[in-house]
Design a protein with these regions (language model features):
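Extracytoplasmic cell-surface/polysaccharide-interacting catalytic and binding patches
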Residues: 1-159, 163-164, 174-188
């Protein structure tokens, strides 16, 4: 986006992410490793000047797979223990699977079990619990509704505006504090 800037953090892999997500990303990858899975970061920040950069230009999105994956095939990657662990646990660290399976018509992208996006812990847990994409969450926060065929029935009982975005630099041990009235402000 024009005028969007962020403090960059270069990972050991050479990829860049927004400094604000680094601690949560590190905590997630350390937990993944402790669970016995080896991983490789396959992508991160891409300048908005680069064609096809999309949300990578925010520094909030990155790709990660099992260590020995050569080709990003969703059918293969989604079955790898590393990516299964990441998909099941990423929300605890503030991340979502950005393009989940079965939501292609909503996201406009094929299933990508390696593509993760930071949204904050509260939003990530809410979205994952309620089977929501970022697009569906945005719709709910802005007063719209989503199909119960694509979201769990819990969405009707939960107020998404009660979800608060926390400081993305906070560690997982830190107390979550609201930094904004709108939980999507962190995404802009």
């Amino acid at each position: 986006p024009d005028g969007y800037t962020f403090e960059q953090h270069t990972l050991n892999s050479g990829y860049i992410v927004d400094e604000r997500i680094y601690n949560d990303l590190l905590a997630m990858l350390e937990a993944c490793n402790a669970a016995g899975s080896e991983y490789t970061i396959k992508g991160g920040y891409i300048s908005a000047d680069t064609e096809g950069s999309g949300e990578y230009a925010t520094g909030l999105a990155f790709d990660v797979t099992a260590h020995d994956v050569a080709e990003l095939d969703p059918a293969v990657v989604s079955q790898l223990p590393t990516n299964q662990w990441l998909m099941q646990n990423c929300s605890s660290f503030g991340f979502i699977v950005r393009y989940p399976e079965g939501k292609e018509s909503i996201t406009g992208h094929n299933f990508e079990p390696w593509h993760f996006r930071y949204v904050g812990r509260d939003a990530a847990v809410f979205m994952t619990t309620n089977n929501l994409t970022l697009e569906e969450f945005y719709t709910l926060v802005n007063g719209g509704s989503v199909s119960t065929a694509t979201a769990t029935s819990a969405t009707s009982a939960v107020d998404p505006t009660a979800v608060t975005a926390e400081d993305p630099s906070a560690t997982t041990e830190a107390t979550t504090e609201a930094t904004t009235e709108n939980p999507l402000d962190i995404l802009n």
